[in-house]
Amino acid sequence: MKKKVIITILFCIAVLSIFYVYKSQTSRHMIDKVSKELPIVFSAEFENGDKGTFKYDISSEKYEKISDFIFYELSYSEDHNSIIGSVSEDEFQGIAELNMKDNTFTPIISLSDLNACAKELGLDEIKYSGPGSTSIHMPKYYKDGYTFSWELWRNIICYLTKENDTWHMEVLHRYNGRNYSYFIKEENSEEVIFLETSEEIFKRKLEKGVDRALDDSDLELVLKIPKMEFIDLDGIMEMSDDKSKLVYYKEPEIYIYDLESKKKEHVINQFLFFQHILDLKFSYDEKYLFYTVADVPYMWDDIKQLHFFIVDLESKEKIELTKWKRWDIFYGIDW
């Protein structure tokens, strides 16, 4: 009897060892493939006091500072040669970009110039209250200009262009409730905006030069999504570059939803135990999906301990990368 128990234990140890070796080799192989992708970029303030914007190397799980400025809710340009973000520091307030080749910081427009444009549209002025917060949200490159959300509720989306050294700003969209994220697509010679709210993803056609105030009658429901008890301020919805697919989470699964076929594809299970998913990002070639899982903060404050994950969208293999420290605070991530 004793001999059988020993044999059983040894067998279990052998099986677990083989499984561990297999998982390690699989993870290493996947990391080798993913390391050829463009770097993940994020802005953060770390527990040790270091802060700014950083490039994250997937293979080594190390990061390199590329700017002392925090780029809030940053996003890559279409060619990934630069990033754009909101900056709120004593040295500069407004929208700026960072060249990813030589790390050159370039102001795009100051907060004072933005406020001058906003005043012409009858929008409330944004006041600088010091480093660490901003009311200019989700800035993105778009066509020959830039888009962004104005003020806390993010329900006013603006389009900014410059002609003959003069800035021009128009309101593309207003929404009655709170808005979390948005994407704009050119569809059949028209512009369509996709909006993530607390429980739905909508789309609507945009009419250049037309501000329909708070008229939501022409919003078209794309997808019902689970109501989040806790949601990242810039949302978690992600869309492919051609805006034909979107990624969303419905516990315990991450899905890719095809807007043309209206079919969903299961990506992977991610069970959450006192946790929330805060970011979903395609890789540049859309072969992989990066996402973050945050431990529920103590007393529901704004401090969230993040875990980084990457999924191979073909094999559906998943690897966990860095588990960050409790007081490492992230302000924007893109891939």
Stretch-by-stretch model annotation:
Residues F11-W335:
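Sequence signature of WD/YWTD-type beta-propeller architectures
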Residues M1-A14:
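N-terminal Sec-pathway targeting helices
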